[in-house]
Amino acid sequence: MRSILRPFLIATLFIGCLATAATAQSFEGVLEFTKTTGPVVTSYKYYVKGERIRIEEISARGEVQGIMLVDTRDKTVTAISPERKLYMDVPNMRLPKDVETTVQKTSDMKDMAGYKCEKWVVKSGPEDRVLTYWVAADAFDFFVPLLETLNRKDEQAVFFLEIKDNKGVFPMLGIEQKSDGAEVSRLEVKKVTKGAQKPSLFEIPAGFNKFERN
């Protein structure tokens, strides 16, 4: 009986190890990117560790202007002002935006930020928008839950959530255009660094006070 069961036990253990390894391989590290809207260029950094993400907005001088701590498990967002040493909870009261779109996943490939990226195109006639994403697959499991937690109304986020089977990828380049081809905004990853992140990055710094609305 033992000899009969042994192969099944070994197979079960092997499958369990594979599942654990797959979970453990979720991306952890830093993504640095820019957002261009007209003449305005803003730099950002995403620090990622499991279900927690730290978003930093970087000034032209390289200084951190603002921070958001996002917990995709608890669906919470905390805004931090380094200059004023204040933090506040960001309520999520906005209803998800409903848009009518068509999605095309092409076979076009491009090398970007050290990744082979595939071209995905999302169009909406009623919204007068065409979104082109060049996506990389590297167990970026945090990204869709991040967009859902932030619940932003900008088209770069809204249109990406319209794509089926969008889990585990990250757009190394996202271009928003009007139907006539005029560019509205551009998100472009400049650098991806894998590596363990300190838990303290995702905590409110000591000595910071909570901002209370009157």
Predicted regions and their residues:
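Absolute protein N-terminus
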Residues: 1, 24-25
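Bacterial N-terminal signal peptides that target proteins for export
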Residues: 1-12
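Sec/Tat signal peptide C-region and signal peptidase I cleavage site
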Residues: 18-24
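Extended soluble regions of mature proteins
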Residues: 25-214
